[in-house]
């Protein structure tokens, strides 16, 4: 089995931890790493950022490219990015796991609507 995983908020503390977990699991393949357009790690290899060496998956801010051909997205990005990430996942029939905290009622309503 080869589950293609994408991580939103890939350069943050949780994102880096998830990169390590995905890399260590033989059934998972890191297929995307997404960050905000002002992130200093854009274009860098996600494995290098996570401290495990090159994985060949660079951090991008291009949501359309990121969501291309993923099975599941794990989102630990900011509350500002959740709405667009969730909408893209739903549109592309991609499973979506949200770990971001501090959600307001509007985001909770959107999550419930998309569930």
Give residue ranges: language-model regions.
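Rossmann-fold NAD(P)-binding glycine/threonine-rich loop
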Residues: 86-92, 99-115
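Hydrophobic beta-strand scaffold residues
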Residues: 30, 96-97
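N-terminal glycine-/serine-/threonine-rich beta1-alpha1-beta2 phosphate-ribose binding loop
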Residues: 1-91
């Amino acid at each position: 089995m080869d589950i293609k995983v994408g991580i939103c908020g890939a350069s943050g503390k949780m994102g880096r931890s998830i990169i390590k977990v995905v890399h260590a699991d033989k059934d998972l393949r890191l297929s995307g790493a997404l960050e905000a357009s002002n992130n200093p790690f854009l274009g860098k290899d996600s494995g290098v950022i996570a401290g495990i060496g090159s994985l060949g998956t660079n951090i991008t801010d291009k949501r359309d490219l990121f969501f291309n051909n993923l099975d599941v997205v794990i989102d630990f990005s900011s509350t500002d990015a959740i709405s667009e990430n969730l909408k893209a996942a739903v549109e592309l029939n991609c499973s979506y796991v949200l770990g971001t905290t501090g959600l307001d009622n509007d985001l909770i309503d959107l999550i419930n609507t998309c569930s």
